[in-house]
Amino acid sequence: MKSSFSTVSSYSDHKFAVKDAPTTIRDSLRLTNAVEDPGYMTLSLISENKVDDLMFNSKMFQDHMVNDFRPKFSHADSSEIMITLNNLKNDILSTKNIRELESTDLRSEVAKQFAARRAELVSHLNASLRPLIDEVFSMEQRLKAFDAENADFVGKTKQYKSTFRSEVHSRIRAGQSKLDALRHGLQTEINSLEAIIEREFAQAANRLNQEVSNFKESFDASERNIKLQKKHVISGMNEKIKSFAESVAKYLPILKKNSEERRFNQMMMQKNLAEIMTVLSDNSEHFGDYCFSDLVPDTRIFDAIMTTKVD
């Protein structure tokens, strides 16, 4: 069996694990076989503070420990095991004190190194940040100056705005007054023009009505004169046609007796008839279409004249 309980450093590589709170010595300190090598033992402690309270006696060991170490300690007696465990306890306490001392010295050294490093970093930061701090301070001064200029500009702007608003309102009121006066004068002119236009329109309407009335009277008089003239012309033409018909009726027997004379008279009658027809045709616009209806009873004379053959 390999044993490494003789030196303090031999326990630095052992594993310590925290488990449930100890209730017995067996629970407080348990030695188990190592997995890698059965010849070594691994020590598991619940708490280092419990080491001072460990009390060992042969009966406790016999009740709680012997069965766990069989057959490793089958030939060892109780006193040797107790001595070994006490040595282990002392070694653990010594290791604890040494570690506390080493931890104190290390803490002091680390504090010194930290202070030195801190001073170095502060110095480096001061050297690096000084231009930036100066620039920030300069920018702050310029910002204050800009704020002052901005405040002055804002004050002047407000004053200018107030003055401008007053001036604009004054001009608007003056313009409104002029506009009202112009609107009043324009309305007066419009009313005057409307009155003149209405008066002129009424006069023109009266003159137009008078002219229309005069024209109507003149047209009616002209129409009456035309009808009267038509009547006279038609009456005269009827008289002439009647006289011509009587002459034709008078000369028809003579035409039958003397062909030469009849031929001459027939030509003369045809000539006279042609002249009458020409006169009637030229004056048809004055007589109208109905003037020939008044000649219907005597048309047989014209037919006799126009159809009579000259031998």
Swiss-Prot record:
Primary localization: cytoplasm
Coiled-coil stretches: 185-233
Annotated source species: Giardia intestinalis
Subunit details: Interacts with EB1.
Keyword annotations from UniProtKB, A to Z: Coiled coil, Cytoplasm, Cytoskeleton, Microtubule
Gene disruption phenotype: Morpholino knockdown has deformities in the ventral disk including shortening of the microribbon structures and flattening of the ventral groove, and increased number of cells with four nuclei. Knockdown has no effect in the adherence ability of the cells.
Record's protein name: Giardin subunit gamma
Transmembrane portions of the chain: none
Keyword Coiled coil among record annotations: yes
Localisation per UniProt entry: Cytoplasm, Cytoskeleton
Keyword tRNA processing: no
Any one GO molecular function term: structural constituent of cytoskeleton
GO cellular component: cytoplasm; median body; microtubule; ventral disc; ventral disc dorsal microribbon
GO biological process, one term: microtubule cytoskeleton organization
Physiological role: Giardins are involved in parasite attachment to the intestinal mucosa and in the cytoskeletal disassembly and reassembly that marks the transition from infectious trophozoite to transmissible cyst. They may interact with other cytoskeletal proteins such as microtubules in the microribbons or crossbridges, to maintain the integrity of the ventral disk. Involved in formation of the ventral disk.
